[in-house]
Protein backbone atom coordinates (compact mmCIF):
# COMPACT_ATOMS: atom_id res chain seq x y z
CA UNK A 1 0.00 0.00 0.00
CA UNK A 2 1.45 3.37 -1.01
CA UNK A 3 1.75 5.96 1.76
CA UNK A 4 0.97 8.75 -0.69
CA UNK A 5 -2.26 9.01 -2.70
CA UNK A 6 -2.06 7.98 -6.37
CA UNK A 7 -2.08 10.19 -9.45
CA UNK A 8 -1.69 9.41 -13.14
CA UNK A 9 0.15 11.55 -15.67
CA UNK A 10 -0.87 10.86 -19.29
CA UNK A 11 1.51 12.75 -21.56
CA UNK A 12 2.44 12.79 -25.22
CA UNK A 13 2.90 14.95 -28.29
CA UNK A 14 0.06 16.75 -29.99
CA UNK A 15 -2.29 14.60 -32.12
CA UNK A 16 -1.21 11.40 -30.35
CA UNK A 17 -4.60 10.37 -28.94
CA UNK A 18 -4.19 11.40 -25.29
CA UNK A 19 -7.78 12.55 -24.79
CA UNK A 20 -9.32 9.35 -26.16
CA UNK A 21 -7.17 7.17 -23.90
CA UNK A 22 -7.88 9.36 -20.87
CA UNK A 23 -11.61 8.98 -21.45
CA UNK A 24 -11.26 5.21 -21.85
CA UNK A 25 -9.34 5.03 -18.56
CA UNK A 26 -11.93 7.13 -16.76
CA UNK A 27 -14.65 4.69 -17.85
CA UNK A 28 -13.04 1.84 -15.92
CA UNK A 29 -11.15 3.60 -13.11
CA UNK A 30 -12.30 5.97 -10.35
CA UNK A 31 -10.52 8.84 -12.10
CA UNK A 32 -11.30 12.52 -12.56
CA UNK A 33 -9.61 14.35 -15.42
CA UNK A 34 -7.43 17.45 -15.20
CA UNK A 35 -6.28 19.11 -18.43
CA UNK A 36 -2.58 19.98 -18.70
CA UNK A 37 -2.69 22.27 -21.72
CA UNK A 38 -1.79 25.95 -21.93
CA UNK A 39 -4.28 26.60 -24.76
CA UNK A 40 -7.30 24.64 -23.50
CA UNK A 41 -7.63 27.03 -20.57
CA UNK A 42 -9.11 29.63 -22.95
CA UNK A 43 -12.80 30.02 -23.73
CA UNK A 44 -13.79 30.50 -27.36
CA UNK A 45 -10.72 28.67 -28.62
CA UNK A 46 -12.15 25.25 -29.40
CA UNK A 47 -11.34 24.20 -32.94
CA UNK A 48 -7.70 25.24 -33.15
CA UNK A 49 -6.88 23.66 -29.78
CA UNK A 50 -8.59 20.34 -30.63
CA UNK A 51 -10.56 20.82 -27.42
CA UNK A 52 -12.68 17.82 -26.39
CA UNK A 53 -16.21 18.19 -27.72
CA UNK A 54 -19.02 19.63 -25.60
CA UNK A 55 -20.55 16.15 -25.48
CA UNK A 56 -17.28 14.65 -24.24
CA UNK A 57 -16.84 17.37 -21.63
CA UNK A 58 -20.41 16.91 -20.44
CA UNK A 59 -19.93 13.17 -19.93
CA UNK A 60 -16.28 13.30 -18.86
CA UNK A 61 -15.59 16.69 -17.25
CA UNK A 62 -12.04 18.03 -17.43
CA UNK A 63 -10.75 20.48 -14.85
CA UNK A 64 -8.83 23.53 -16.12
CA UNK A 65 -10.58 23.77 -19.49
CA UNK A 66 -12.41 27.02 -20.39
CA UNK A 67 -11.32 28.80 -17.22
CA UNK A 68 -9.96 32.01 -18.77
CA UNK A 69 -10.75 34.68 -21.34
CA UNK A 70 -8.20 34.85 -24.20
CA UNK A 71 -7.18 38.34 -23.05
CA UNK A 72 -5.80 36.87 -19.82
CA UNK A 73 -2.43 35.24 -19.23
CA UNK A 74 -1.78 31.96 -17.45
CA UNK A 75 1.56 30.82 -16.10
CA UNK A 76 3.08 27.54 -15.00
CA UNK A 77 2.77 28.82 -11.44
CA UNK A 78 -0.95 29.47 -11.98
CA UNK A 79 -1.35 25.96 -13.34
CA UNK A 80 0.51 24.38 -10.43
CA UNK A 81 -1.69 26.16 -7.91
CA UNK A 82 -4.91 25.25 -9.73
CA UNK A 83 -3.86 21.65 -10.37
CA UNK A 84 -2.83 21.03 -6.76
CA UNK A 85 -6.18 22.34 -5.55
CA UNK A 86 -8.07 20.14 -8.03
CA UNK A 87 -5.98 17.09 -7.12
CA UNK A 88 -6.68 17.60 -3.42
CA UNK A 89 -10.43 17.79 -4.06
CA UNK A 90 -10.38 14.67 -6.24
CA UNK A 91 -8.32 12.72 -3.71
CA UNK A 92 -10.64 13.79 -0.88
CA UNK A 93 -13.50 12.14 -2.78
CA UNK A 94 -11.54 8.90 -2.94
CA UNK A 95 -10.80 9.23 -6.66
CA UNK A 96 -7.57 9.33 -8.66
CA UNK A 97 -6.45 12.54 -10.41
CA UNK A 98 -5.67 11.75 -14.06
CA UNK A 99 -3.72 14.62 -15.56
CA UNK A 100 -3.74 14.59 -19.35
CA UNK A 101 -2.12 16.93 -21.84
CA UNK A 102 0.97 17.99 -23.72
CA UNK A 103 2.21 21.13 -21.98
CA UNK A 104 5.30 19.52 -20.55
CA UNK A 105 6.42 22.61 -18.64
CA UNK A 106 3.21 22.34 -16.60
CA UNK A 107 3.85 18.69 -15.78
CA UNK A 108 7.41 19.55 -14.77
CA UNK A 109 6.28 22.47 -12.61
CA UNK A 110 3.72 20.28 -10.88
CA UNK A 111 6.18 17.47 -10.24
CA UNK A 112 9.24 19.46 -9.15
CA UNK A 113 7.94 22.87 -8.16
CA UNK A 114 9.04 26.17 -9.64
CA UNK A 115 12.01 28.41 -9.20
CA UNK A 116 11.18 31.46 -7.11
CA UNK A 117 10.97 33.81 -10.08
CA UNK A 118 10.07 37.48 -9.58
CA UNK A 119 6.55 38.54 -10.44
CA UNK A 120 5.82 40.43 -13.64
CA UNK A 121 6.78 44.09 -13.53
CA UNK A 122 4.67 46.34 -15.75
CA UNK A 123 7.21 49.18 -15.87
CA UNK A 124 10.09 46.89 -16.86
CA UNK A 125 7.95 45.20 -19.50
CA UNK A 126 6.86 48.53 -20.95
CA UNK A 127 10.50 49.63 -21.24
CA UNK A 128 11.52 46.36 -22.90
CA UNK A 129 8.66 46.60 -25.38
CA UNK A 130 9.62 50.21 -26.15
CA UNK A 131 13.22 49.11 -26.70
CA UNK A 132 12.03 46.38 -29.05
CA UNK A 133 9.98 48.87 -31.06
CA UNK A 134 12.93 51.25 -31.28
CA UNK A 135 15.80 48.83 -31.88
CA UNK A 136 14.21 45.49 -32.86
CA UNK A 137 13.82 42.15 -31.13
CA UNK A 138 17.30 41.06 -32.20
CA UNK A 139 18.72 43.86 -30.08
CA UNK A 140 16.91 42.49 -27.02
CA UNK A 141 18.09 38.99 -27.86
CA UNK A 142 21.67 40.31 -28.01
CA UNK A 143 21.20 41.78 -24.52
CA UNK A 144 19.94 38.44 -23.24
CA UNK A 145 22.93 36.63 -24.75
CA UNK A 146 25.20 38.78 -22.58
CA UNK A 147 23.39 38.29 -19.24
CA UNK A 148 21.93 34.80 -19.77
CA UNK A 149 23.54 32.94 -22.69
CA UNK A 150 21.82 29.65 -21.81
CA UNK A 151 18.35 31.20 -22.11
CA UNK A 152 19.40 33.09 -25.24
CA UNK A 153 20.40 29.79 -26.86
CA UNK A 154 16.93 28.31 -26.39
CA UNK A 155 14.79 31.43 -26.99
CA UNK A 156 14.36 32.56 -30.59
CA UNK A 157 14.65 36.30 -31.32
CA UNK A 158 11.12 36.13 -32.78
CA UNK A 159 9.63 34.84 -29.51
CA UNK A 160 8.87 38.15 -27.77
CA UNK A 161 6.88 36.66 -24.89
CA UNK A 162 9.72 34.47 -23.62
CA UNK A 163 12.40 36.99 -24.54
CA UNK A 164 10.77 39.75 -22.51
CA UNK A 165 10.21 37.42 -19.57
CA UNK A 166 13.86 36.32 -19.48
CA UNK A 167 15.12 39.92 -19.55
CA UNK A 168 12.46 40.99 -17.06
CA UNK A 169 13.60 38.33 -14.57
CA UNK A 170 17.18 39.56 -14.84
CA UNK A 171 16.35 43.26 -14.54
CA UNK A 172 13.99 42.79 -11.59
CA UNK A 173 16.04 40.29 -9.57
CA UNK A 174 19.62 40.75 -10.76
CA UNK A 175 19.72 36.99 -11.39
CA UNK A 176 19.32 35.28 -14.74
CA UNK A 177 16.46 32.89 -15.37
CA UNK A 178 19.04 30.12 -15.75
CA UNK A 179 20.47 30.90 -12.30
CA UNK A 180 16.98 30.80 -10.78
CA UNK A 181 16.34 27.41 -12.37
CA UNK A 182 19.69 26.01 -11.27
CA UNK A 183 18.88 27.12 -7.74
CA UNK A 184 15.52 25.35 -7.93
CA UNK A 185 17.15 22.18 -9.29
CA UNK A 186 19.61 22.16 -6.40
CA UNK A 187 16.78 22.60 -3.91
CA UNK A 188 14.78 19.79 -5.55
CA UNK A 189 17.80 17.48 -5.46
CA UNK A 190 18.38 18.27 -1.81
CA UNK A 191 14.70 17.67 -1.02
CA UNK A 192 14.74 14.33 -2.83
CA UNK A 193 17.88 13.25 -1.00
CA UNK A 194 16.25 14.04 2.33
CA UNK A 195 13.14 12.05 1.43
CA UNK A 196 10.92 15.08 0.83
CA UNK A 197 8.77 15.33 -2.28
CA UNK A 198 7.63 18.41 -4.17
CA UNK A 199 4.44 16.63 -5.24
CA UNK A 200 2.81 14.63 -2.44
CA UNK A 201 1.48 11.87 -4.69
CA UNK A 202 2.63 8.52 -6.00
CA UNK A 203 2.69 9.26 -9.73
CA UNK A 204 2.41 6.75 -12.57
CA UNK A 205 3.75 8.21 -15.82
CA UNK A 206 2.15 7.17 -19.11
CA UNK A 207 3.00 8.53 -22.55
CA UNK A 208 1.32 7.82 -25.87
CA UNK A 209 2.60 8.48 -29.40
CA UNK A 210 2.86 6.65 -32.72
CA UNK A 211 5.98 4.49 -32.81
CA UNK A 212 6.68 5.83 -36.31
CA UNK A 213 7.30 9.60 -36.31
CA UNK A 214 6.07 9.82 -39.92
CA UNK A 215 2.66 8.63 -38.77
CA UNK A 216 2.50 11.47 -36.26
CA UNK A 217 3.39 13.98 -38.97
CA UNK A 218 0.57 12.60 -41.13
CA UNK A 219 -1.87 12.89 -38.23
CA UNK A 220 -0.79 16.48 -37.57
CA UNK A 221 -1.32 17.48 -41.21
CA UNK A 222 -4.70 15.74 -41.38
CA UNK A 223 -5.89 17.32 -38.15
CA UNK A 224 -4.90 20.81 -39.27
CA UNK A 225 -6.84 20.30 -42.50
CA UNK A 226 -9.83 19.07 -40.51
CA UNK A 227 -9.65 22.13 -38.26
CA UNK A 228 -9.85 24.38 -41.30
CA UNK A 229 -12.83 22.40 -42.59
CA UNK A 230 -14.52 22.73 -39.19
CA UNK A 231 -14.33 26.53 -39.25
CA UNK A 232 -10.99 27.42 -37.69
CA UNK A 233 -10.78 30.67 -39.69
CA UNK A 234 -14.22 31.74 -38.49
CA UNK A 235 -13.18 31.01 -34.91
CA UNK A 236 -10.17 33.31 -35.23
CA UNK A 237 -12.27 35.93 -37.02
CA UNK A 238 -14.61 35.94 -34.02
CA UNK A 239 -11.65 36.50 -31.70
CA UNK A 240 -10.36 39.35 -33.89
CA UNK A 241 -13.77 40.99 -34.02
CA UNK A 242 -13.69 41.58 -30.27
CA UNK A 243 -11.13 44.34 -30.77
CA UNK A 244 -9.24 43.76 -27.52
CA UNK A 245 -7.05 40.85 -28.64
CA UNK A 246 -3.75 41.10 -30.50
CA UNK A 247 -1.02 38.85 -31.87
CA UNK A 248 1.26 39.39 -28.88
CA UNK A 249 -1.05 37.69 -26.37
CA UNK A 250 -0.16 34.17 -25.18
CA UNK A 251 -3.55 32.89 -26.37
CA UNK A 252 -3.11 34.19 -29.92
CA UNK A 253 0.49 32.99 -30.02
CA UNK A 254 -0.74 29.41 -29.60
CA UNK A 255 0.27 27.11 -32.45
CA UNK A 256 -2.16 27.46 -35.34
CA UNK A 257 -3.78 30.64 -34.06
CA UNK A 258 -0.80 32.85 -34.82
CA UNK A 259 -0.58 31.49 -38.38
CA UNK A 260 -4.30 32.03 -39.01
CA UNK A 261 -4.06 35.51 -37.44
CA UNK A 262 -1.20 36.39 -39.82
CA UNK A 263 -3.27 35.07 -42.74
CA UNK A 264 -6.20 37.26 -41.76
CA UNK A 265 -3.77 40.19 -41.46
CA UNK A 266 -2.80 39.57 -45.09
CA UNK A 267 0.73 38.49 -44.21
CA UNK A 268 0.25 34.90 -45.42
CA UNK A 269 -1.74 33.30 -48.20
CA UNK A 270 -4.07 30.48 -47.21
CA UNK A 271 -1.58 27.94 -48.54
CA UNK A 272 1.30 29.55 -46.60
CA UNK A 273 -0.83 29.68 -43.46
CA UNK A 274 -1.68 26.01 -43.71
CA UNK A 275 1.90 25.00 -44.43
CA UNK A 276 3.32 27.09 -41.58
CA UNK A 277 0.62 25.91 -39.19
CA UNK A 278 1.50 22.29 -39.89
CA UNK A 279 5.23 22.98 -39.59
CA UNK A 280 4.73 24.82 -36.28
CA UNK A 281 2.69 21.91 -34.94
CA UNK A 282 5.41 19.45 -35.95
CA UNK A 283 7.98 21.64 -34.18
CA UNK A 284 5.78 21.62 -31.08
CA UNK A 285 5.66 17.82 -31.20
CA UNK A 286 9.45 17.71 -31.50
CA UNK A 287 9.82 19.87 -28.38
CA UNK A 288 7.35 17.64 -26.53
CA UNK A 289 9.39 14.56 -27.46
CA UNK A 290 12.53 16.30 -26.16
CA UNK A 291 10.87 16.77 -22.77
CA UNK A 292 9.55 13.22 -22.73
CA UNK A 293 12.93 11.66 -23.51
CA UNK A 294 14.28 13.14 -20.28
CA UNK A 295 11.31 12.00 -18.16
CA UNK A 296 12.01 9.35 -15.54
CA UNK A 297 9.96 6.14 -15.15
CA UNK A 298 7.91 6.69 -18.29
CA UNK A 299 5.79 3.88 -19.75
CA UNK A 300 5.20 4.30 -23.50
CA UNK A 301 2.14 3.25 -25.49
CA UNK A 302 1.81 3.19 -29.28
CA UNK A 303 -1.04 5.37 -30.58
CA UNK A 304 -1.83 2.80 -33.28
CA UNK A 305 -2.08 -0.19 -30.94
CA UNK A 306 -5.57 -1.61 -30.39
CA UNK A 307 -4.96 -2.68 -26.79
CA UNK A 308 -3.69 0.51 -25.17
CA UNK A 309 -6.36 0.47 -22.47
CA UNK A 310 -5.42 -3.01 -21.29
CA UNK A 311 -1.71 -2.19 -21.54
CA UNK A 312 -2.19 0.98 -19.49
CA UNK A 313 -4.22 -0.86 -16.85
CA UNK A 314 -1.61 -3.60 -16.65
CA UNK A 315 1.12 -1.02 -16.11
CA UNK A 316 -0.87 0.86 -13.48
CA UNK A 317 -1.44 -2.40 -11.65
CA UNK A 318 2.25 -3.29 -11.82
CA UNK A 319 3.28 -0.06 -10.09
CA UNK A 320 0.57 -0.52 -7.43
CA UNK A 321 -1.16 2.71 -8.43
CA UNK A 322 -4.53 0.95 -8.17
CA UNK A 323 -3.90 -0.63 -4.75
UniProtKB/Swiss-Prot annotation:
EC number: 2.5.1.75
InterPro entries named in the record: Dimethylallyltransferase, IPT, P-loop_NTPase
Residues the record lists as binding substrate: 14-19
UniProt keyword annotation of Mitochondrion present: no
Chain sites annotated for binding ATP: 12-19
Top-rank EC class of the record's enzyme: transferase
Residues flagged as site, Interaction with substrate tRNA: 103, 125
GO molecular function: ATP binding; tRNA dimethylallyltransferase activity
Domain of life where this protein originates: Bacteria
A Pfam family assignment: IPPT
Interaction with substrate tRNA as annotated region, ranges: 37-40, 161-165
BP-aspect Gene Ontology terms: tRNA modification
Obligatory cofactor(s): Mg(2+)
Reactions mediated catalytically: adenosine(37) in tRNA + dimethylallyl diphosphate = N(6)-dimethylallyladenosine(37) in tRNA + diphosphate
Secretion signal span: none
Subunit structure: Monomer.
Family: Belongs to the IPP transferase family.
NCBIfam families: miaA
HAMAP family for this protein: IPP_trans
Name of the protein in its database record: tRNA dimethylallyltransferase
Organism of provenance: Pseudomonas syringae pv. tomato (strain ATCC BAA-871 / DC3000)
Gene encoding the protein: miaA
Amino acid sequence: MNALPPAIFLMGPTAAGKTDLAIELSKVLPCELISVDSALVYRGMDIGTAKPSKAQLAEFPHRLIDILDPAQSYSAADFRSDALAAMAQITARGNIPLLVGGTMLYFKALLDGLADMPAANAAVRAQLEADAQAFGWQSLHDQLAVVDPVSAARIHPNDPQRLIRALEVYRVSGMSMTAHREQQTAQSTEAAASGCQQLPYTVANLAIAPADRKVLHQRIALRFEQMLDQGFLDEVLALRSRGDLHAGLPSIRAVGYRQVWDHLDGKLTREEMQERGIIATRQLAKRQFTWLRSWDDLHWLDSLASDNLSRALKYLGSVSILS
